[in-house]
Amino acid sequence: MTARLRPELAGLPVYVPGKTVPGAIKLASNETVFGPLPGVREAIERATDAVNRYPDSGCMELKAALAKHLGSDFAPEHVAVGCGSVSLCQQLVQITASVGDEVIFGWRSFELYPPQVQVAGATAIQVPLTNHTFDLAAMLASVTGRTRLIFVCNPNNPTSTVVAPDALTRFIDAVPPHILIAIDEAYIEYVREPMLPDSLELVRAHSNVVVLRTFSKAYGLAGLRVGYAVGHPELITALNQVYVPFTVTAISQAAAIASLDAADELLARTDAVVAERARVSAALRAAGFTSPPPQANFVWLPLGPRTPDFVTQAANARIVVRPYGTEGVRVSVGAPEENDALLRFARDWITRTEA
């Protein structure tokens, strides 16, 4: 090809999603096993009547519904909507970082942080995890005059860990106020006390804090792509400036609004996942696996160099999990019968490999 492309794209990997294998148990993408919440199907059907029209690019009705959901301290001006929270991550990089700037995050973490930073021409500062958890002290020590943005993935993907709420507060208090801190809470609905942070209070108290959430996970709208950010109005305005118009469809907006009206059902569903998470995690530890206490809808198995064999043998057993090189495996919490199949395989695998 003769067209001249940006040098930042050199070596940039293409994102590889979790595999879908017909007939196999998919525990690779952290999807909920539940369908849409009550009222969502009807909202989607009604929205299809107007698909010949462009959606509301400002997502005004959804922003108003989210502000009401978040509480009386928040108005629509505190909310930005994006095509999944991943697009909002990219928008945050766009509005803060360019060539010569630095973006800090723990590693291993969400796979799209590094390429998003690379495309911007900025430098990714990857701070190693401690005990599979973001090391906030080390991240603070990594702050320089070039730091523009810090991502705190909480719960962290793929390790399913959270930072202690008081430690997060101290960290935010210590970071210079001109540096934006993004708390990425894609899995926050699965966190339970005492590890549940009051991230919205951190937004209220600090104009340099933004919280990212999504409808893809607990709400079960992964196929519709809706996420949102909560932050200071000036920050929200900047996010809107780099938002690609019309990317959140009318159907997606309608489904998200309807989902907010099903809070009781959402809690019942997440409680069911949390119970299964505890069962799966305990059974894996009893079988001889090591794993940090999970706080999301998945479990992290730090298998090291044994990772490829586990993944291959799981695939042979018609179970698809998510590998991370030779670091470990992320296993989503599925339906009880899916989890039972995983546990049978895992017990057999560890017995054979450690015999």
Where are these regions (language model features)?
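Hydrophobic "anchor" residues on beta-strands that sit immediately upstream
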Residues: 149, 180-181, 209-210
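PLP-dependent aminotransferase class I/II
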Residues: 208-285, 289-292
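PLP-dependent enzyme catalytic core of the Aspartate aminotransferase-like
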Residues: 166, 312-355
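N-terminal small-domain helix-loop-helix segment of the aminotransferase-like
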Residues: 2-86, 91
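Conserved PLP-binding catalytic core of the aspartate aminotransferase-like
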Residues: 273-274, 278, 282-317, 333
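Conserved core of the PLP fold type I
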Residues: 52-176, 187-205
